[in-house]
Amino acid sequence: MDKLSVNHLCGYGLEVPDLKVASDFYTAFGLRASIAEDRLLMQTAHEGPSELIAIQGLEKRLHHLSFGIHASDMPKFEEHLKKIGSPTTASPQKGLREGLWFQDPWGTWINLTPTTVIQDPFKNLKVPRVDRHLWRELPKEIKPNRLGHMLMFTQDWEKVEAYYCLALGLKVSDRAAGKVSFMAGGSGVRDHHCFGLINSTHRGFQHSSFQVNSVDEIGLGAMQMQKAGFTDGFGIGRHALASNLFYYTRDPWGSWIEYYADMDKISDSWQAKDWNELPYVWPQWAPEFWGKEMNANHERK
């Protein structure tokens, strides 16, 4: 059981007060939308389970997390979760997602669904530039490749980190000491993180991040969102931890969505570190914005 691990974050669910508002926002971002009963199913260009399921609710709230596992690990996870006191149970809503369902000790629903391991959709980052006009070949519409990661606000930050490592086999890849824990799943070479925990007073959704191919696609995605009327955002920039390029847009409920590219990869030999001071790479963000806006948990306790 010591090597049992989820492979990656394959989806999440949000309760939202208006599915039409959600559809307009996420389709502007480049996701495909379809309606199923009282929920909105959103997918990237990647084939597989819906990366985002928006469910009709009274207000915006994090509804569930979904992680991909090997099909052969399903019975192993079921046994493992029972042993640690988090037995699997029925889905909170019929037909929501396939696989195993359980609640963590703080009440958040978690789904484990059998999927194939996600690979980067591009093999060569170096685009030949001899005798060609690159600008003429850039995409007219940005459609993200896949869901890369999401961050969740939580109370009991250290206990939650320990539980998610135990229950899901996630591995801490780096920490902003006392503030944020970045976590990776699976084995071999993979993204620096697929999930993260932000120290807060209670649970909540902070942001999700979707991969695109280049800095050009991030910039074009930012323009795409602004043209659609979603002008509250920041970037383009490069993070310190994970080193990825980014652009964030605020969603209609005060949380965030991100285009990202060019993230650090880690291997099984990677050693996590606690960082007490993190430099701003570029741009020079205002610390009060990062603290009061980006990390504001708007969900009720």
Give short role names for the model-derived ranges.
Residues L4-S50, E98, M152-H192:
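Core segments of cupin and vicinal oxygen chelate
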Residues A22-T27, L81, G107, V160, ...:
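Conserved active-site tyrosine of GNAT-family acetyltransferases
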